[in-house]
Curated annotation (Swiss-Prot):
The lineage of its organism: Bacteria, Pseudomonadati, Chlamydiota, Chlamydiia, Chlamydiales. This is Large cysteine-rich periplasmic protein OmcB, serovar E. Changing I121L: In strain: DK20. It comes from Chlamydia trachomatis. GO terms for molecular function: extracellular matrix structural constituent. The keyword Disulfide bond applies. Residues 52-61 have a biased composition (Basic residues). Residues 23-40 form a propeptide.
Length: 547
């Protein structure tokens, strides 16, 4: 027990002296003398065999060696690093300095060494907190020669070894081994110091907002039908996007219910991963391609755009009908009906319906269903750019102006589509004016009277105009008087009636002339009829026997 006490005291004292020596407080001769005294004192104290006095002596000795605010840990034995050389140096013992500073440093040296044989000095630095710029300095023994170190370094001019450690984390260890060779007998004092800067770390979380915009919309739409677009905005970044704004100009050819040409949506701040959806609705006003562009912007970020192109289709069907502007009644007239699809969509279930006016009779319509005065054609599909043609042959029974109405109805992806057309024909009648002349008394005695009656009839289908009548008699007959729808004049043996402005179809008028027989013979009376429809006047002769 005494031996152990003596060893502990000796190690403590020697270490303290070494520290003073390394710091420059003691000269070499003073250090050797002090070490000898310490060893002698240790022998004396060991004989007292009192632990209390041993602790008191240790405390006083610490004060004498000027080791302030440091607690020297109990000495313990350790194995030497490197090859086992018990014959060259003794067992390693460690001196440990415990404090509340940044780095804990321990130094292990052998109890004894042999002159001329290298021995190790082991320095271990342990971070008590995160430190940077750690500098460990080792003072070489005065009567020893530097052999090598790990990590490698070179002694300075004043016999110091310096190692620099950029960073030593909390709990991290850094070990240094120095090999020295004693040159003469005596005590080899060595000391190590450490200097470090504590490292304080703080964390600021940095992120980057990333606003993305996508847009959904139809590839095709119908004219004057609502077109809806969905604008999807999402923050795919790692930070809040501030003041997010979406601008959507109204595309050319579109109209918005607000009347504005640029729509602006303020979304405010968007958290990472947050998603917003905006719905816009437009009304297309013309056919063609329209591109809707949405642009999103936010504070400090780049603008992003998304666009959708929509083809605006117009379902369209056109129909036309062509026929004679006029014709005579009972004469056939052909109408040509043309149906076309100038639009962008396929027309389905196309129905072409031709309605004729009353008084017109359908004579022929190929491929159609005929019902009274209605003609109907049906087609399953009519592709864009395709056209069809139909013919119908009709005849009017009576004069007049009659209209032929055609309506086309169809279905498409954009709904129903209708078109109509008409053609008007003026049907003319033909006037057929006839005349009949008879005498009421035949034969007639001289001095008696007879009456010539003239009936004018329009047997045609149209009126006749400016109907004129003139009668000429032979010398045996003398006109006495006359009557009729118009006035007349008697000039000698001739009677002329004023023109009748109009003689309607199937209308009959009668003229009469009273004649006196003035001489015997075979008398003659000639009636001459003219009108606008009679290119050559018509004459009729009646004879009367006078005795």
């Amino acid at each position: 027990m005494n031996k152990l006490i003596r060893r502990a005291v000796t190690i403590f004292a020697v270490t303290s002296v070494a520290s003073l020596f390394a710091s420059g407080v003691l000269e070499t001769s003073m250090a050797e003398s002090l070490s000898t005294n310490v060893i002698s004192l240790a022998d004396t104290k060991a004989k007292d065999n009192t632990s209390h006095k041993s602790k008191k002596a240790r405390k006083n000795h610490s004060k004498e060696t000027l080791v302030d605010r440091k607690e020297v840990a109990p000495v313990h034995e350790s194995k030497a690093t490197g090859p086992k050389q018990d014959s060259c140096f003794g067992r390693m013992y460690t001196v440990k300095v415990n404090d509340d500073r940044n780095v804990e440093i321990t130094q292990a040296v052998p109890e004894y060494a042999t002159v001329g044989s290298p021995y190790p000095i082991e320095i271990t630095a342990t971070g008590k907190r995160d430190c940077v710029d750690v500098i460990i300095t080792q003072q070489l023994p005065c009567e020893a020669e530097f052999v090598r170190s790990d990590p490698a370094t070179t002694p300075t001019a004043d016999g110091k070894l310096v190692w620099k450690i950029d960073r030593l984390g909390q709990g991290e260890k850094s070990k240094i081994t120095v090999w020295v060779k004693p040159l003469k007998e005596g005590c080899c004092f060595t000391a190590a110091t450490v200097c470090a800067c504590p490292e304080i770390r703080s964390v600021t979380k940095c992120g980057q907002p990333a606003i993305c915009v996508k847009q959904e919309g139809p590839e095709n739409a119908c004219l004057r039908c609502p077109v809806v677009y969905k604008i999807n905005v999402v923050n795919q970044g790692t930070a809040i996007a501030r003041n997010v704004v979406v601008e959507n100009p109204v595309p050319d050819g579109y109209a918005h219910s607000s009347g504005q040409r640029v729509l602006t949506f303020t979304l405010g701040d968007m958290q990472p991963g947050e998603h917003r959806t905006i719905t816009v609705e437009f009304c297309p006003l013309k056919r063609g391609r329209a591109t809707n562009i949405a642009t999103v912007s936010y504070c400090g970020g780049h603008k992003n755009t998304a666009s959708v192109t929509t083809v605006i289709n117009e379902p369209c069907v056109q129909v036309s009908i062509a026929g004679a502007d006029w014709s005579y009644v009972c004469k056939p007239v052909e109408y040509v009906i043309s149906v076309s699809n100038p639009g962008d969509l396929v027309l389905r279930d196309v129905v072409v319906e031709d309605t004729l006016s009353p008084g017109v009779t359908v004579l022929e319509a190929a491929g159609a269903q005929i019902s009274c005065n209605k003609v109907v054609w049906t087609v399953k599909e009519l592709n864009p750019g395709e056209s069809l043609q139909y013919k119908v042959l009709v005849r009017a029974q009576t004069p007049g102006q009659f209209t032929n109405n055609v309506v086309v109805k169809s279905c498409s992806d954009c709904g129903t589509c209708t078109s109509c057309a008409e053609a008007t024909t003026y049907w003319k009648g033909v006037a057929a004016t006839h005349m009949c002349v008879v005498d009421t008394c035949d034969p007639v005695c001289v001095g008696e009277n007879t009456v010539y009656r003239i009936c004018v009839t329009n047997r045609g289908s149209a009126e006749d105009t400016n109907v004129s009548l003139m009668l000429k008699f032979s010398k045996e007959l003398q006109p006495v008087s006359f009557s009729g729808p118009t006035k007349g004049t008697i000039t000698g043996n001739t009677v002329v009636f004023d023109s009748l402005p109009r003689l309607g179809s199937k209308e009959t008028v009668e003229f009469s002339v009273t004649l006196k027989a003035v001489s015997a013979g075979d008398a003659r009376g000639e009636a001459i009829l003219s009108s606008d429809t009679l290119t050559v006047p018509v004459s009729d002769t009646e004879n009367t026997h006078i005795y």
